[in-house]
Amino acid sequence: MKIGIIAYQGSFEEHFLQLKRAFDKLSLNGEIISIKIPKDLKGVDGVIIPGGESTTIGLVAKRLGLLDELKEKITSGLPVLGTCAGAIMLAKEVSDAKVGKTSQPLIGTMNISVIRNYYGRQKESFEAIVDLSKIGKDKAHVVFIRAPAIAKVWGKAQSLAELNGVTVFAEENNMLATTFHPELSDTTSIHEYFLHLVKG
């Protein structure tokens, strides 16, 4: 199994480590690679889009030709996990809590509406307990950093976890989106769930 992590910025190194732990926990053999240009996608079984600055990631991916390639592969069924900025990238609808509608480059394959900076810029980061029982896991201690919120899900998209009534983890077919940073959590639950999705 080969998993690629978009490695322009953000906590991609932490995703590497968390993914390795998840592979070990599930007794799976896996290869983890960095993805920066379209040819890096060759032969990957799943992709992680980490946190960072969603507009920057989108612009760089577009300039290097990766954005369209990702969209095509994800639409064709390539499993993907988008965390924080990655969740924004996957959303079909994006707005900003302060400035409203945005025109940033997106992959835009998932039936979710995301609000950037939902918790306000002054609340840069916070930690919370999230119930992961819908994926057969225990509650998890997770980290939110300038987090967005999934304001709406529709079609085949469904909410897998909420915090104070707001969706923080959603799934649609081959796509997973979290508004928190599972790579900074003390549990590998989200990465394990992603690997099960990749494994089929």
From Swiss-Prot:
CDD domains: GATase1_PB. InterPro entries: Class_I_gatase-like, PdxT/SNO, PdxT/SNO_CS. In the presence of PdxS, forms a dodecamer of heterodimers. Only shows activity in the heterodimer. Catalyzes the hydrolysis of glutamine to glutamate and ammonia as part of the biosynthesis of pyridoxal 5'-phosphate. The resulting ammonia molecule is channeled to the active site of PdxS. Its EC number is 4.3.3.6, 3.5.1.2. GO terms for molecular function: glutaminase activity; pyridoxal 5'-phosphate synthase (glutamine hydrolysing) activity. Gene3D superfamilies: 3.40.50.880. The active site is at residues 84, 181, 183. Keywords: Glutamine amidotransferase, Hydrolase, Lyase, Pyridoxal phosphate. L-glutamine binds at residues 52-54, 116, 145-146. The lineage of its organism: Archaea, Thermoproteota, Thermoprotei, Sulfolobales, Sulfolobaceae. Pathway: Cofactor biosynthesis; pyridoxal 5'-phosphate biosynthesis. Belongs to the glutaminase PdxT/SNO family. This is Pyridoxal 5'-phosphate synthase subunit PdxT. GO terms for biological process: glutamine catabolic process; pyridoxal phosphate biosynthetic process; pyridoxine metabolic process. It catalyses: aldehydo-D-ribose 5-phosphate + D-glyceraldehyde 3-phosphate + L-glutamine = pyridoxal 5'-phosphate + L-glutamate + phosphate + 3 H2O + H(+); L-glutamine + H2O = L-glutamate + NH4(+). GO terms for cellular component: cytosol; glutaminase complex. HAMAP family: PdxT (MF_01615).
